[in-house]
Amino acid sequence: MKILIAASGFDSPRKHEVNIFALDQAKALRDAGHDVRFAAVDTRSIRHSRPWGCYRYTLDGIPVYYASVPCGALPLGLPELAGRVAASSIRRAIAKDGWKPDVIHQHFGFELAAMAEREGIPFVFTEHSSLHNRALSPEKAEHLKRKYECCAAVLAVSQALAKNMRANTGVEAIVVPNIVDTVQFAPKRIAHERFTFVSAGNLIPVKNMAGLLHAFAALHGEPRLIIFGDGPESGALRALCAELVLYSRVSFRGHCPRNELAEAYAGADCFVLASRSETFGVAYIEAMAAGLPVIATRCGGPEDFVTEENGILIPVDDESTLTSAMERMMLRREDYDSAAISADIRRKFAPETIAARLTELYEGVLSC
């Protein structure tokens, strides 16, 4: 099957960075025997330095069509126009190569929907946005409903997101979660002396790293906390760490590639993230694939996969309960079977599992 995976919001091909979730799907489908190409639409503002126009290159063995049309926060209608211009340039580049997909599957945006309609190709869309975690205005809900109804299939990355999409638009989404790299994130243990918690996420308010630091400060004993990620709250969180006199026990490691994160998980005992909102929660899943039990909040995504066998679920913005959960984990870490936790994640989220589900979905769409 010829499949075009597409997504919005990318850095330049010079950095070889595209949306990791969508690229993971493209690679999994390629490995399943399909002819897969990738389309990247970049309509960020001119402030983001990058080449403009349409370029073709290869990333991890996947042919990529990258279209950059600077736009950013412009008046209503102009961003969609920029997206259409970018999509048109991608369509022309694909046609020049003499290749036509059987299915177009886009994440995060609808730029390639017009190409699908023009070429008579089924258009599949995956929703990731936390926009649905609150009630939408009638105008916004109607706008999204019209977009969804033009799709051959609409997917959501979690049950909670699908439920919220139904509440906002009445559209029934099919749940297909993100892929987790179960090769990089596999059970491995590195000996260490002190109990070690690890967390990973953008340093932004919704990840609630400040709440995690407050909860950690209330723990007894001398556990360690390692935080991976970068973002606008970095300075404030480091200042809070100093204020709470935690610098000897907390370390900030910044953004790092997957292999470094996996190595850190091998030397940790528990993953903890006190998010206020998640549509999926790939950070939790990666840690579990590495065999770590997790402490997660009931914030949308984790309810789909956190159980008594692999971790602890707590309410959002409840620092005292978070402290109690961390204390419980320190006392009862050996109750959790790392091999079983990892095996369950592999069964549900491995590349071959998700590729098989998507293949079945595409075949159903093409048979209609």
Language model segments and positions:
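Short alpha-helical donor nucleotide-sugar binding micro-motif in glycosyltransferases
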Residues: 255-256, 263-268
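An aromatic- and histidine-rich active-site surface loop
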Residues: 14, 80-88, 103-120
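Conserved donor-binding/catalytic core segment of Leloir-type glycosyltransferases
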Residues: 4, 189-207, 213-216, 226
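Aromatic "clamp/platform" in nucleotide-sugar-dependent glycosyltransferases that forms part
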Residues: 276
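Carbohydrate-associated surface elements
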Residues: 160, 179
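Conserved acidic donor-binding segment of nucleotide-sugar-dependent glycosyltransferases
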Residues: 308, 312-319, 328-334
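Short hydrophobic beta-strand element within catalytic cores of glycosyltransferases
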Residues: 293-296
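N-terminal subdomain of nucleotide-sugar transferases
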Residues: 1-53, 363
